[in-house]
């Protein structure tokens, strides 16, 4: 179908922004529909995965419940056998484990029934719960028969438990078959959902390809072709050719670009004419400026020579004043260092005094503790005397018991062995008591020697403290004298520094004036050179303007 003239005019005036808006809107709608479809498919898949997971959990709950129920009955049987063998403690543990397993299996069955919402599972789950209650009752009867040690009652309830377990196994098989069929049904539904999603994705892909082709055709016809034409105009303008006029194309963004390009071409033509006029005026002004700058440069050179002589004289005076200031500052610094050393010595003496006092107090405390230790050692010796007396009496009693056992003959042999062991223990206790008494005697002697040594250390520490206090008083006098010397040196250094500062300020001002004079001379020289360069640039500018084709 060939587009009519009105249609072509409409496309020429169609805003690129509007066209791109429609294209992007179609793409956005396609993307939105694709996203919604994918979201719907994902929700369906999530539901199916959840159902499969619940089905698997139901099978696990059912199998674990039956396994724990079987283990509960097995523990009761083991407990019954152990109780018959006289192992009551082990049988009790078996009974407790059976109760725990029965409670866990009951919880799993209740959870299975609660989650069995399908009609096909609901009836079987209810029957399973009732049958499990019968089985739990039979196992409880086994535990009761075990506690009563009734073999007849145990075999009776054991038969009931076996029958209930048989029905539970049959129900488990039916439930597992039903759950498996439900899982297969979910997988078939998932396959059908996947096929629908794939077909929908292919359709959306076809729509996207068609939209992409239409978008490319619009961009190639309404954007790329006009931009190539505009690029040709830009290349000609960049090369200096302004002779080819720019024609407008429509009222859209590309048309506005061509209108602005036309305005730029005309503006460059006007600018080139103005530049040509300005170049002639600059040539005349540069000649006059060159003469004025030559005269200014000569005057500034003479002024710089006179300032150089004045700056040299002030620099020599500044050097002398700074030497005086440095000597005063050096003296002040030396005095300050002496003051710091004196202060440091005073602090160290103060720390020595505090340390000596603390050491004296600690030695006195240690001496008191050692005195307490001596008393405690004496108390321990008294306790050991009592223990030794008790062991001697125990030895005598064991000897009497051995004699009585010997009189009893064969009937008292076991008692004689015990009496002999008691006598041996009493003998060992007596020997250990003697060894401890010897060690306590050594500790007591060492402690008394330590107390005497502590007392001597206390006396020496007190003497050291008195000497340190006297040294601190002497250092305090030295510190005060150094402080007065430091204050006087600071006054001298401050006065010398003020004089040096004034001299430096004068020297700096003269140097600044000389620097400004040099800068002015250099500026005049640069201005002269710039005026000459400006004359050359005027010629070059005229030549450049001549290169353009208007």
Swiss-Prot record:
Membrane topology (Cytoplasmic): 1-19, 220-550
Species for this entry: Pseudomonas putida (strain ATCC 47054 / DSM 6125 / CFBP 8728 / NCIMB 11950 / KT2440)
Record bears the keyword rRNA processing: no
TM stretches of this protein: 20-40, 199-219
InterPro entries according to UniProt: Chemotax_Me-accpt_rcpt, HAMP_dom, MCPsignal_dom, Tar_rcpt_lig-bd
GO cellular component terms listed in the entry, alphabetical order: plasma membrane
Free-text comment about domains: The ligand-binding domain (LBD) forms a four-helix bundle (4HB), and both ligand binding sites of the dimer are occupied with the high-affinity ligands protocatechuate and quinate, whereas the lower-affinity ligands benzoate and salicylate are present in only one site. Ligand binding causes rigid-body scissoring movements of both monomers of the dimer.
Positions of salicylate binding: 71, 75, 135
Protein's cellular compartments: Cell inner membrane
UniProt membrane topology term: Multi-pass membrane protein
Assembly notes: Ligand free PcaY_PP-ligand-binding domain (LBD) is present in a monomer-dimer equilibrium. Only the dimeric LBD is able to bind ligands which in turn causes dimer stabilization.
Keywords of this entry: Cell inner membrane, Cell membrane, Chemotaxis, Membrane, Methylation, Transducer, Transmembrane, Transmembrane helix
Name this protein carries in UniProt: Methyl-accepting chemotaxis protein PcaY
Gene knockout outcome: Disruption of the gene abolishes chemotaxis to benzoate, quinate, protocatechuate and shikimate. Inactivation of the gene does not alter competitive plant root colonization.
Binding annotation for L-quinate: 71-78, 135, 142, 158
Residues the entry annotates as binding benzoate: 71, 75
Domain Methyl-accepting transducer, residue spans: 278-514
Entry function: Chemotactic-signal transducers respond to changes in the concentration of attractants and repellents in the environment, transduce a signal from the outside to the inside of the cell, and facilitate sensory adaptation through the variation of the level of methylation. PcaY recognizes a wide range of compounds containing a C6-membered ring with a carboxylate group. Binds preferentially compounds that serve as carbon sources and among them those that rapidly promote growth.
Domain spans labelled HAMP: 221-273
Membrane side Periplasmic: residue ranges: 41-198
Alphabetical list of Pfam families matching this protein: HAMP, MCPsignal, TarH
């Amino acid at each position: 179908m060939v587009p009519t003239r009105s249609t072509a005019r409409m496309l020429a005036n169609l805003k690129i922004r509007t066209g791109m808006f429609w294209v992007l809107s179609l793409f956005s709608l396609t993307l939105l529909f694709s996203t919604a479809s994918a979201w719907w498919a994902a929700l369906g898949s999530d539901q199916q995965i959840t159902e499969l997971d619940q089905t698997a959990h139901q099978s696990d709950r059912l199998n674990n419940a039956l396994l724990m129920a079987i283990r509960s009955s097995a523990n009761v049987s083991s407990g019954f056998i152990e109780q018959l063998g006289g192992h009551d403690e082990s049988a009790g543990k078996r009974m407790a484990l059976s109760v725990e397993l029965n409670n866990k299996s009951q919880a799993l069955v209740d959870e299975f029934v609660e989650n069995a919402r399908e009609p096909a599972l609901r009836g079987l789950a209810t029957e399973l719960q009732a049958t499990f209650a019968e089985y739990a009752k039979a196992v409880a009867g086994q535990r009761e028969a075990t506690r009563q040690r009734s073999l007849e009652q145990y075999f009776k309830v054991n038969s009931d438990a076996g029958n209930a377990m048989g029905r539970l196994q049959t129900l488990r098989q039916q439930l597992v078959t039903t759950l498996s069929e439900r899982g297969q049904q979910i997988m078939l539904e998932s396959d059908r959902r996947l096929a629908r999603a794939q077909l929908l994705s292919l359709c959306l892909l076809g729509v996207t390809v068609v939209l992409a082709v239409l978008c490319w055709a619009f961009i190639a016809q309404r954007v790329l072709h006009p931009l190539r034409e505009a690029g040709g105009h830009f290349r000609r303008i960049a090369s200096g050719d302004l002779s080819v006029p720019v024609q407008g194309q429509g009222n859209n963004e590309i048309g506005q670009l061509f209108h602005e390009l036309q305005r730029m071409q005309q503006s460059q033509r006007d600018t080139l004419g103005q530049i040509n006029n300005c170049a002639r005026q600059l040539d005349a002004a540069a000649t006059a400026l060159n003469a004025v700058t030559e005269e200014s440069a000569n005057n500034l050179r003479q002024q710089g020579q006179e300032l150089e002589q004045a700056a040299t004289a002030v620099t020599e005076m500044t050097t002398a004043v700074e030497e005086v200031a440095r000597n005063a500052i050096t003296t002040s610094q030396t005095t300050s260092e002496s003051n710091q050393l004196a202060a440091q010595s005073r602090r160290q003496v103060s720390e020595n005094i505090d340390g000596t006092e603390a050491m004296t107090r600690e030695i006195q405390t240690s001496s008191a503790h050692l005195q307490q230790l001596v008393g405690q050692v004496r108390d321990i010796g008294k306790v050991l005397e009592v223990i030794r007396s008790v062991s001697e009496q125990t030895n005598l009693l064991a000897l009497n018991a051995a004699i009585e056992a010997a009189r009893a003959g064969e009937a008292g042999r076991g008692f004689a062995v015990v009496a002999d062991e008691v006598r041996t223990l009493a003998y060992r206790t007596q020997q250990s008591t003697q060894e401890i008494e010897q060690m306590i005697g050594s500790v007591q002697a060492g402690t008394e020697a330590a107390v005497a040594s502590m007392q001597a250390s206390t006396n020496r520490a007190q003497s050291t403290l008195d000497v340190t206090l006297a040294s601190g008083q002497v250092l305090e006098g030295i510190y005060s004298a150094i402080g007065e010397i430091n204050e006087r040196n600071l006054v001298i250094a401050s006065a010398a520094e003020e004089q040096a500062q004034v001299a430096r300020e004068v020297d700096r001002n003269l140097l600044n004036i000389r620097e400004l004079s040099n800068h002015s001379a250099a500026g005049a020289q640069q201005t002269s050179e710039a005026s000459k360069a400006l004359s050359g640039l005027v010629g070059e500018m005229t030549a450049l303007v001549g290169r353009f084709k208007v």
